[in-house]
Regions:
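Disorder-to-helix initiation segments
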Residues: 29-51, 129, 136
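Alpha-helix capping/hinge segments and adjacent helical runs
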Residues: 100-109, 139, 146, 188
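Acidic/histidine-rich alpha-helical segments that form the ligand environment
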Residues: 111-167
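A structural signal for well-ordered alpha-helices, especially hydrophobic packing surfaces
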Residues: 52, 59, 66, 85, ...
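Conserved alpha-helical segments that form or flank metal/cofactor-binding pockets of metalloenzymes
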Residues: 70, 76-112
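Carboxylate-rich helix-loop segments that flank metal/cofactor sites and access channels
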Residues: 22-29, 99-128
Length: 188
């Protein structure tokens, strides 16, 4: 037997648990997100985008170096480049997915990357390992510089995204040290 109190409870529960129909499209994202979570500001989106394009370009230029490196320590340099490329790809995916979690739109298209990266153009043709070491170190340091340039603004708005930058910085700085050590001479 269903009493009036039971009916009220059932009605109240079914009203509370009623889900909204699924929506899609950019116009509704801000409305939905305003109801349920954090939306990245334009500045946060732009800062994460800067890191994203440099990571994508780092992976691309790393592959160019990987294919065209020749000379002493070829095998070690070739393998080390694979490690850098893999890390840059994983980090770019992490940054892009973080942007989506914040309802920002990552843009990894080749024309966007080419137009906005801070990395200098990579030379064509075969390149000696010693030169590759210098070129890759320069690109690692440029990407590190981008992460450091945007860090404080990112941290102020979204500490979680700043934590991602910390992980990127730690690994890229380690790579820069290890790669650059190939061409260093001991201090006398």
């Amino acid at each position: 037997m269903v009493t009036t109190a039971t009916k009220k409870t059932q009605t109240s529960t079914s009203t509370r648990n009623k889900r909204r129909p699924a929506r899609s499209g950019a116009e509704l994202t801000k409305e939905q997100n305003a109801e349920s979570g954090f939306t990245a500001s334009a500045e946060l989106s732009e800062n994460l985008q800067k890191v994203l394009v440099d990571l994508i370009e780092l992976a691309s230029q790393g592959k160019q170096a990987h294919w065209n490196v020749v000379g002493k320590n070829f095998r070690d340099t070739h393998r080390q480049l694979d490690e850098i490329i893999e890390a840059a790809r994983e980090f770019s995916d992490t940054v892009a997915e973080r942007m989506r979690a914040l309802h920002a739109l990552p843009d990894g298209r080749s024309d966007t990357v080419a137009e906005t990266t801070t990395l200098p153009e990579f030379p064509q043709g075969e390149i000696d390992t010693a030169e590759v070491v210098d070129l890759v170190t320069e690109r690692l340091e440029a990407t590190i510089g981008t992460c450091r340039d945007v860090h404080d603004a990112v941290d102020e708005e979204d500490p979680t995204s700043a934590d991602i930058l910390h992980a990127i910085l730690e690994k890229l700085e380690q790579f820069a040290w290890m790669v650059s050590a190939e061409n260093r001479v001991p201090a006398t």
